[in-house]
Regions:
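Outer-membrane beta-barrel translocator/pore domains, especially the C-terminal barrels
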Residues: 2-176
């Protein structure tokens, strides 16, 4: 379990329109609003947990982390894309699975606090066989996080450490 309590006697500056995403890597940071010259005002408590499974040779096979921010009251001056302005933020997390060194699957997500909507979903997968590397990305943003959505794939052949040949495609998905 992890916990972060932030207290500021000052009110937040109005940064509600900045383009900043909250993710599992900055959720437990005091600078999570993404502004060097501004502090998050009011009181907040961030709760979450990390879990990992390692192989016998200490290689990480599975890891997950999930967290959520709780505030004593709404603060409409905080970034709308992050849901930090609500009493309880989105549930934010990451799941990584790598059963072998040749396969890595990584998933970042933001789920609405009542878990009925996924507001942000970013899935990456990478498969390496000999010198061939294939990777896939899928992004979907909903509601206040944004409206971008795409699927991309990259196929590469690595001749040596400094030379490779790659082929990339990306399909943007248009949503209303």
């Amino acid at each position: 379990p992890k916990a972060l309590f932030l207290f500021s006697p000052f009110k937040s500056e109005n940064i509600s329109q900045i383009d900043h995403n909250l993710n599992s890597s900055n959720l437990f940071s005091s600078g999570r609003i993404g502004q060097n010259d501004s502090l998050e005002g009011g009181n907040s408590l961030t709760l979450g947990f990390d879990y990992s499974v390692n192989s016998q040779n200490d290689r990480e096979i599975f890891s997950s982390n999930i967290g959520q921010i709780f505030r004593d009251k709404n603060d409409e001056k905080l970034p709308l894309k992050t849901s930090m302005n609500n009493k309880s933020s989105d549930l934010i997390g990451n799941i990584k699975f790598s059963p072998r060194e040749e396969l890595i699957i990584d998933y970042d997500f933001n789920a609405d606090n009542n878990l009925d909507t996924i507001n942000y979903s970013f899935l990456t997968a990478k498969v390496s066989v000999n010198n061939f590397i294939t990777s896939f990305e899928f992004l979907e943003e909903n509601n206040n996080v944004g409206s971008e959505s795409y699927f991309s794939r990259k196929i590469s052949y690595e001749f040596n450490e400094g030379n490779l040949l790659s082929f990339n495609t990306r399909r943007n998905r248009k949503r209303d």
